[in-house]
Each structure stands twice: as structure tokens, then as C-alpha cells.
């Protein structure tokens, strides 16, 4: 079921899901892919982005064959939709596939999870070729229309079985993707606060306090290493900074989601992203998840009672070559759809629709 806009309608799983069953992050990790898949089945449906599959340079295919794993390949360049996930699920079932493998960026990671879900919860191995989001790790899929409008999230009651992230591939991606993932990772600390000036153990659940503590640690590492990592990726170098940032963007961001049961680690920043994709679908198309989330987090900082932090945060965004405002991503501030965005944000699950909160927005 797609995620509703009302908190009362969002069905949350009572179980904590702390991460992937197995997580591999190293240079040459594609050579281990076949062995990871063979643990789960002898035939796989591989769903891959065309550019991502090319970026594996034949190593994924060789590893699968060397491990005795047969596979069907679907090169998929489109949005992560319910319709295509159900078609992929039917393909997997009718061809006798026992495991789903996703190779690519966030949309492919989410399509692989949705496919596995509709195929009766087949096992999943994710091969992220981008560190722009934690999609490989998170137990949910962000779903879209074919045109790219957001339909909310499809949530799962289980973790992915394995993640295989080859750092030789990651250090060759455009640094823009790493920067977007950094902003998405930094968002966790900001959005967990959601309307609070600070997070205290006495005021929140131990799960959310744990999520905040981990997110705060990650935030400080981002401040220290983000620029170096992006510089190194631009030069195609695999360094400690790149390894650290990749781990934070994918694994740690995913763990933050898990220890908060998948709700509470995101708020107005991510809701802004969802609403921009919904109301300004065409304008948003050229922009990455973290680029839009970061714009929303400027609002989130003010809503948290820290307007003084907006300027330094925007300065950091500028240093990472991020757009700073909705106008920067081609949205006319005088568009009548802006009122729709505002009202949807005001009536979102992340704030009480009071006069005080309306003034804070």
C-alpha cells in the first residue's frame, strides 16, 4: 500500500529492521556478487539501469556465471512504478527466478525491492552503483507514476538480504551523486528534531534517540570529509574519505531508518521533496533526491527553532554545488501551485495544523 499523507493512515511495522542481512563494501566487490546470490538461489532476475550495467564492465555477469547462477536480464531505464514492478514480478515467477538482483541507482534499488515484494517476497541482493541515497539499504521503495510524480512509499516487513557495493565503481561516478547523498544523509539529524530545538532521551523513544545519536555522528563526519570525498571522486580516486562517505550515505543512513522503525528519521525536508515531485513534476525531473531534500531542510531548520542555522547550512550547500532554493530548480515562486504545496506541507503528518505552526512555516 502506498504511504498516505495522514499519519493515522500510515501503517508502520512494529519490528525494528536494523539493516541488510549482509553488507559488502570494498574494491572489487563485484567479484563476490555471484557467491552472495548463490546463497539465495540458482536463478536470478537482474534488473539493471543501462548505464549502471555498463559500469560493471562485465564483472557482475562473470561473477554470476562463475558461481553457477543463471539469470534473466532486464535493462530498465524508467521510473520505479507499481505497474513495472508487477510486470517484473511476473517475469521472475514465469521464468523460475528464485532471487531478485538490482544493479543501479536509487530507482533501480527500489524497483528490485518492489519486484521481490510482488513476486511473493523473493530474496533481494542490491548492487548500488551510486551513493546518492540509502535506497539499497532501506526496507521501503519510493514509488512514482510513469511521469515521475511521487506516490509515496511502499514499506516492507523485512530487510534486503545482501548489498554488494563495489568501490571501484563508486569512485568513478559523477561527484554530484555523492554530494546529493551527503545532503540526504545530513538531513537525518535535522529532520529527526522536527519542531524541537534539541533531542533529549526523556522526550523521545530510545529508538529515535539512537537514530538521532547516530545521525549526529554522521553529520559531523560529513562536515569534516564531504568536500575531500567529492574531490577524490571527481579525480576517480578511492580514498578513506570516499570509503567513509559511501558507508555513511548507504549503510549508516539505512541504519538510522531502521532503528527508528522507518518513521521519525524524515520530516519536512523529505516531505518537501515528495510534494515538489508531485506538484512540480517536470521542473523537478533534472534534480536528484538529496538536492531537493536539502532545500526543504532549510525550512526544517527554521521550524526546529534554529533560523540562525539556515545561512551556514546554505553556505555548505553552496560549497557542494547544490541548488539553494525552489527557484533555483526552476519553480516559479508565484505559481498558484505553491499554495497547494504549502497547504499539503502544513497538513502533512509532520506537523499539527495550528496557527502557531502556520506562522512558523
Regions found by a protein language model. Give the residues of each.
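C-terminal charged capping/lid subdomain of soluble metabolic enzymes
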Residues: 2-10, 198, 306-361
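ATP/NTP phosphate-donor binding region
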Residues: 2-99, 326
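A short, small-residue-rich loop immediately preceding and capping a beta-strand
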Residues: 92-130
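Active-site segments that bind and position negatively charged phosphate/pyrophosphate groups
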Residues: 203-316
Amino acid at each position: 500500500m502506498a504511504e498516505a499523507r495522514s499519519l493515522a493512515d500510515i501503517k508502520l511495522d512494529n519490528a525494528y529492521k536494523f539493516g541488510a542481512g549482509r553488507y559488502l563494501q570494498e574494491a572489487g566487490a563485484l567479484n563476490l556478487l555471484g557467491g552472495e546470490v548463490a546463497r539465495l538461489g540458482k536463478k536470478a532476475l537482474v534488473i539493471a539501469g543501462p548505464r549502471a550495467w555498463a559500469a560493471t564492465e562485465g564483472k557482475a555477469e562473470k561473477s554470476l556465471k562463475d558461481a553457477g547462477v543463471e539469470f534473466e536480464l532486464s535493462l530498465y531505464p524508467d521510473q520505479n512504478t507499481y505497474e513495472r514492478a508487477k510486470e517484473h514480478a511476473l517475469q521472475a515467477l514465469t521464468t523460475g527466478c528464485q532471487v531478485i538482483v538490482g544493479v543501479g541507482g536509487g530507482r533501480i534499488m527500489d524497483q528490485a525491492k518492489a519486484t521481490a515484494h510482488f513476486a511473493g517476497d523473493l530474496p533481494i541482493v542490491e548492487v548500488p552503483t551510486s551513493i546518492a541515497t540509502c535506497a539499497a539499504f532501506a526496507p521501503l521503495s519510493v514509488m512514482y507514476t510513469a511521469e515521475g510524480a511521487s506516490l509515496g512509499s511502499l514499506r516492507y516487513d523485512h530487510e534486503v538480504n545482501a548489498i554488494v557495493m563495489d568501490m571501484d565503481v563508486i569512485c568513478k561516478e559523477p561527484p554530484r551523486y555523492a554530494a546529493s547523498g551527503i545532503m540526504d544523509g545530513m538531513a537525518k539529524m535535522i529532520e529527526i528534531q522536527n519542531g524541537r530545538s534539541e533531542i533529549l532521551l526523556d522526550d523521545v523513544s530510545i529508538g529515535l534517540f539512537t537514530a538521532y545519536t547516530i545521525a549526529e555522528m554522521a553529520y559531523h563526519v560529513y562536515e569534516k570529509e564531504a568536500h575531500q570525498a567529492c574531490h577524490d571522486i571527481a579525480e576517480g580516486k578511492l580514498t578513506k574519505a570516499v570509503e567513509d562517505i559511501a558507508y555513511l550515505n548507504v549503510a549508516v543512513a539505512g541504519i538510522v531508518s531502521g532503528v527508528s522503525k522507518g518513521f521519525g528519521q524524515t520530516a519536512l525536508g523529505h516531505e518537501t521533496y515528495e510534494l515538489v515531485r508531485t506538484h512540480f513534476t517536470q521542473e523537478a525531473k533534472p534534480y536528484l533526491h538529496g538536492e531537493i531534500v536539502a532545500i526543504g531542510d532549510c525550512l526544517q531548520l527554521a521550524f526546529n527553532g534554529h533560523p540562525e542555522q539556515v545561512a551556514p547550512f546554505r553556505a555548505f550547500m553552496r560549497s557542494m554545488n547544490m541548488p539553494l532554493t525552489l527557484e533555483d530548480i526552476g519553480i516559479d515562486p508565484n505559481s498558484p501551485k505553491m499554495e497547494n504545496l504549502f497547504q499539503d506541507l502544513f497538513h502533512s503528518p509532520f506537523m499539527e495544523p495550528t496557527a502557531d505552526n502556520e506562522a512558523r512555516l
